[in-house]
Amino acid sequence: MKMRRLLGASAALVLAISSTVASAEGKAVTIGYVDGWSDSVATTNVAAEVIKQKLGYDVKLQAVATGIMWQGVATGKLDAMLSAWLPVTHGEYWAKNKDLVVDYGPNFKDAKIGLIVPEYVKAKTIDDLKTDESFKGRIVGIDAGSGVMLKTDQAIKDYGLSNYTLKASSGAGMIAELTRAEKKNESIAVTGWVPHWMFAKWKLRFLDDPKGVYGAAETVNSIGSKELATKAPEVAKFLKNFQWASKDEIGEVMLAIQDGAKPEVAAKDWVTKHPERVADWTK
């Protein structure tokens, strides 16, 4: 998930969604997602595949901005979304729309942001960076102004890392730096989050954050419109049951997409390979 500062949707964009998201007739649902978030793409496509295969619904996926996704579900123009980071990241959206939507619970637990390192480095906590010269006084970040970058600026101050520089980059740039470091077995600290496909590719861990700068773990929740339970009761029941078991499980799908598979193909392959998980979700 690209942890960008969340922006409110404009009235014009809200009107735009009404023209692109039509109310489907019969057994059909429309689900919103954020195209730039790898976890949103993976989770939404897997859910859509299960809903189509096992519940017999047509599913339309609508890529929208975060604010429009929330407003779309709140107004019933979208039937559901599976990308609500709670209670903090999307806290303002929840506060504004909680009486207009239904929370079907988490589809991923222990979502979090922070500083990530390869398992082979010696540092265990952010505080350890102060005396560990192997990192060469550098933390590799993503987009300047994103939530995790703002928190990292704060962490540098709170932990007294005056000898460190936070390098703004992009998601792709951060991954490129991590790839190079992994190949050379070098120390590197990057800004990141789970769920993310990089945890399926490499052995990584978060540096402990005893000061709590990055906050506690969150959950990624499935949110439905008020009308969903009446319109599509089987889908509503599925959303209550749908939950990833671990970051490695969703990581399989995200990594397949990162390696070039189309999201719908990666989702279909995963559903085919894991019938027992699908059975748990649809019982």
Regions found by a protein language model. Name each.
Residues 26-45, 66:
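Extracytoplasmic "Venus flytrap"
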Residues 82-97, 180-205:
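A ligand-binding cleft/hinge motif common to bilobed small-molecule-binding domains
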Residues 112-122, 218-232:
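A bilobed periplasmic-binding-protein/Venus flytrap-type ligand-binding module shared by bacterial periplasmic
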Residues 37-38, 60-72, 166-177:
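Short helix-initiation/N-cap motifs at beta->coil->alpha
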Residues 38-57, 156:
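Short, polar/charged alpha-helical segment
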